[in-house]
């Protein structure tokens, strides 16, 4: 069986941020199925160490490349060409991904863009419509977000997919 390769853009999955921990929980749950591999651009304002990591016990199936911010056009183009991922999954506030949506036609010609998103208050942010419409799927972390998506960008496929929870804690 060939594993699906997912390119992930988010906070560094081993960081203690909410975005980082949610990303890690999602990745680990999918790795346990044996059907996926993850190449992560682990975002931060600045890293102390930019050495790529293979996360134990997953090895080549869970690789992290530390990046400043969440990446840029050149990094995405390079990763798409070298790694040939099957999907792009990304998470954090939309204001950090304007650069990505600038090249969404380029990206979406090769693989679907899945945005894991939360916007927790009304009124619906109509100013985000272009961002929402630049994805193949928006996975909504809250029911409020899902209602907002159905209002602001009804033509975009969206699903309610709440935060992951580590059952150990």
For every predicted segment, state its role.
Residues 110-112, 137, 157:
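Proline-centered loop/turn at the N-terminus of a beta-strand
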Residues 1-54, 83:
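N-terminal subdomain of nucleotide-sugar transferases
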Residues 77-97, 112-115:
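Short N-terminal targeting/anchoring amphipathic segment
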Residues 90, 140-141:
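Short beta-strand scaffold positions
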Residues 41, 67, 161:
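Hydrophobic residues at beta-strand termini and immediately following loops
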Residues 144, 164:
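Carbohydrate-associated surface elements
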Residues 48-75:
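Conserved nucleotide-sugar phosphate-binding/catalytic loop shared by glycosyltransferases and other
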Residues 108, 125-137:
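A conserved, positively charged/aromatic
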């Amino acid at each position: 069986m060939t594993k699906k390769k997912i390119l992930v853009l988010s906070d560094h999955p081993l960081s203690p941020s909410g975005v980082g921990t949610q990303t890690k929980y999602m990745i680990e749950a999918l790795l346990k199925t044996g059907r996926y591999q993850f190449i992560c651009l682990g975002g931060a304002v600045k890293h102390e160490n930019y050495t790529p990591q293979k996360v134990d016990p997953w090895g080549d199936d869970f690789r992290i490349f530390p990046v400043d911010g969440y990446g840029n056009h050149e990094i995405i183009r390079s990763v798409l060409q070298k790694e040939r991922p099957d999907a792009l999954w990304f998470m954090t506030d939309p204001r950090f991904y304007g650069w990505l949506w600038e090249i969404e036609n380029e990206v979406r010609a090769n693989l679907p863009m899945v945005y894991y998103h939360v916007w927790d208050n009304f009124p619906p942010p109509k100013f985000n419509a272009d961002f929402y419409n630049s994805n193949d799927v928006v996975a909504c972390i809250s029911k409020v977000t899902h209602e907002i998506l159905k209002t602001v960008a009804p033509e975009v496929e969206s699903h309610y997919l709440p935060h992951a929870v580590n059952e150990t804690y």
